[in-house]
Amino acid sequence: MNTNTQTEQQIIREETRIDKIIKKRKKKMRAQVLLCPTITAYGRLYCAPRRLHRYNSSSSSSQFLNLNLSRFSGALFFHMEQFQSGTGSSGKRGMVENLKRYGVISSKRVAQVMEALDRGLFVPVGSSAYVDTPVPIGYNATISAPHMHATCLQLLEDKLHPGMRALDVGSGTGYLTGCFALMVGAEGRVVGVDHIPELVDMSIKNIEKSVAASFLKKGSLSLHVGDGRKGWQEFAPYDAIHVGAAASEIPQPLLDQLKPGGRMVIPLGTYFQELKVIDKNEDGSIKVHTETSVRYVPLTSRVEQLGGF
């Protein structure tokens, strides 16, 4: 065998070896989802991948997407694993346990509240309530994914002690509003606002079937039809304000209704959005920091929403 033949065979072997490596890498990459820019949240690197904010209409079983952080070629990825979370009490328990396992929930209070209030009562019949994804609720609106509810509850937890006041803008089917009520108790006050009357009616019926029903009956929890961009002045100021849709800028009425020492969590931006945490100082000035990249429906008028934005 001459030198040229040996060289050609070596080249072929090397090309074959490289092809195998590339195919193996591609296969591994397909099973992983690249994270959006990571942030430090709850003592660890965490960021919700954009894929988790989209609804998978082909999913008919109650499966929870486990989030397993690992390193590959110096980058962080989420492994998407399927977990049978079941239905009812076993479903919500499985959902919460997995959010705890992967570092999304670190607060005992938040875990207890999300397990107490059954998400299955707040999604349309036939939807996968315990999958970590947003679910369409009609009227061009969605109920946020469980990991976003958990994130917002933890960001607002210090402002949701018994006796405090909370405003939920874009209250939808009422799930997060009900969570707020469980946290501030009967001596507190929780207000949900949505500009779609049918969703407000739906949220009231949902809460009436839940563990938060007593707060609705007592009057410490109320849901109203209105333009959430204007807040709800009647029970202001609020210790905590949550906005469930993305605004291009912070609505001034919401800032005005935020109590000094209070906190607002709001997604800001158009196509590229960030979840902002706004703390109002005692002198009325504000401090803003970015928590993570997100993707929400826009905070807009009822006409624009029903028209598909």
Curated annotation (Swiss-Prot):
Gene3D superfamilies: Vaccinia Virus protein VP39
Coiled-coil zones: none
Active site residues according to the UniProt entry: 144
Pfam families: PCMT (PF01135)
GO cellular component terms attached to this protein's record: nucleus
Induction comment: By abscisic acid (ABA), drought and salt stress.
Catalysed reaction, written as an equation: [protein]-L-isoaspartate + S-adenosyl-L-methionine = [protein]-L-isoaspartate alpha-methyl ester + S-adenosyl-L-homocysteine
Domain of life: Eukaryota
Expression sites (tissue/organ): Expressed in rosette leaves, stems, cauline leaves, flowers and developing seeds.
Sorted UniProt keywords: Methyltransferase, Nucleus, S-adenosyl-L-methionine, Transferase
Motif (Nuclear localization signal): 23-28
Principal cellular location given in the protein's record: nucleus
Single Gene Ontology MF annotation: protein-L-isoaspartate (D-aspartate) O-methyltransferase activity
EC number assigned by the record: 2.1.1.77
pH dependency: Optimum pH is 7.0.
Localization (cell): Nucleus
GO biological process: methylation; protein modification process; protein repair
Function field: Catalyzes the methyl esterification of L-isoaspartyl residues in peptides and proteins that result from spontaneous decomposition of normal L-aspartyl and L-asparaginyl residues. It plays a role in the repair and/or degradation of damaged proteins.
Cited NCBIfam families: pimt
Family as reported in the entry's similarity comment: Belongs to the methyltransferase superfamily. L-isoaspartyl/D-aspartyl protein methyltransferase family.
Protein name: Protein-L-isoaspartate O-methyltransferase 2
Gene name of this polypeptide: PIMT2
